[in-house]
Curated annotation (Swiss-Prot):
<keyword id="KW-0808">Transferase</keyword>
<dbReference type="GO" id="GO:0008080">
    <property type="term" value="F:N-acetyltransferase activity"/>
</dbReference>
<dbReference type="InterPro" id="IPR003679">
    <property type="entry name" value="Amioglycoside_AcTrfase"/>
</dbReference>
<keyword id="KW-0046">Antibiotic resistance</keyword>
<dbReference type="GO" id="GO:0046677">
    <property type="term" value="P:response to antibiotic"/>
</dbReference>
<protein>
    <recommendedName>
        <fullName>SPbeta prophage-derived aminoglycoside N(3')-acetyltransferase-like protein YokD</fullName>
        <ecNumber>2.3.1.-</ecNumber>
    </recommendedName>
</protein>
<feature type="binding site">
    <location>
        <position position="113"/>
    </location>
    <ligand>
        <name>CoA</name>
    </ligand>
</feature>
<dbReference type="Pfam" id="PF02522">
    <property type="entry name" value="Antibiotic_NAT"/>
</dbReference>
<feature type="binding site">
    <location>
        <begin position="38"/>
        <end position="44"/>
    </location>
    <ligand>
        <name>CoA</name>
    </ligand>
</feature>
<keyword id="KW-0012">Acyltransferase</keyword>
<dbReference type="InterPro" id="IPR028345">
    <property type="entry name" value="Antibiotic_NAT-like"/>
</dbReference>
<comment type="function">
    <text>May contribute to antibiotic resistance.</text>
</comment>
<comment type="subunit">
    <text>Homodimer.</text>
</comment>
<comment type="similarity">
    <text>Belongs to the antibiotic N-acetyltransferase family.</text>
</comment>
Length: 272
């Protein structure tokens, strides 16, 4: 916190963040997928609360604010690498891990303070996926979040697929392209995919069960390169919110570009 204070030229407030968001191009009525880093904004009076209030004030109830609220810890221990756990623990972990609950399962720590607070806000809804949930507030939250499928949880029937057809935007609020969840949707559209089995604890008919499901093997390590190529070829809003470098761009255009980029540039070429 000391470093954040020392690097901040003046206090960031809800009002100053609101003005910066408007200057960036965020408007009333927009549907926007937000990826955020609170610390990058500088010292904020009110912290994550001020940022969330600013987003709500700009977009208003006529728009919709969406954030990824992933909880990747609810996964098969055989996949864990940071740190790995002994194989003799695996069955115990699968049998005893608490099931996903949209009300109290926390977001993965790396998702940031803003979304972790946002999910607790009144009128914010969270989708029902143990790993790849989204939270949303505003006019279209139910249409975007309802019926989130367990299998292929970032695909066409997921909240990402619904955002794609809604002329939505992506706001990188101090985050970089490697956080751009929308690029996952493009991964489902390319002709080479590796399908893997995953598992998580969920509630089925009132009972906790360990459920296996199919998912893609994702290529997040390519997202920064994809985003930089997209930025080089497309106009997007670029500016500052506080100290944070920010970008605002069309989700649909980004997904379409990423699909073509993966086909033309991904040398891995994994076949089904």
């Amino acid at each position: 916190m000391k470093k954040i204070v020392e690097s901040t030229t003046f206090p960031r407030t809800k009002q100053s963040i609101t003005e910066d968001l408007k200057a960036l191009g965020l408007k009333k009525g927009m549907t926007v997928l937000v990826h955020s880093s609170l610390s990058s904004i500088g010292w904020v009076n009110g912290g994550a609360v001020a940022v969330i209030q600013a987003l709500i004030d700009v977009v208003t109830e006529e728009g919709t604010i969406v954030m990824p609220s992933q909880s990747v810890e609810l996964s098969d221990p055989k996949e864990w690498g940071n740190p790995p756990v002994p194989e003799e623990w695996w069955d115990i972990i699968r049998e005893s891990m608490p099931a996903y609950n949209s009300n109290y399962t926390p977001t993965t720590r790396g998702m940031g303070q803003i979304v972790e607070l946002f999910r607790s806000y009144p009128e914010v809804k969270r989708s029902n996926h143990p790993n790849y949930s989204f939270v949303a507030w505003g006019k279209h939250k139910n249409k975007i979040l309802n019926q989130h499928p367990l299998e292929f949880g970032l695909g066409e029937q997921s909240p990402l697929g619904k955002l794609y057809i809604r002329e939505s935007y992506v706001l990188l609020l101090g985050a970089d392209f490697d956080s751009s969840t929308c690029f996952h949707l493009a991964e489902y559209r390319i002709p080479y995919q590796k399908i893997i089995n995953r598992g998580a604890p969920i509630i089925v008919e009132g009972k906790r069960v360990w459920k296996e499901y199919k998912e893609l093997e994702f290529r997040e390590e390519l997202f920064q390169e994809v985003g930089q190529a997209f930025e080089a070829e497309h106009n997007m809003k670029v500016g500052k919110v506080g100290s944070a470098n920010c970008r605002l761009f069309s989700l649909t255009e980004a997904v379409d570009f990423a699909e073509k980029w993966f086909i033309n540039n991904d040398s891995k070429n994994i076949k089904k």
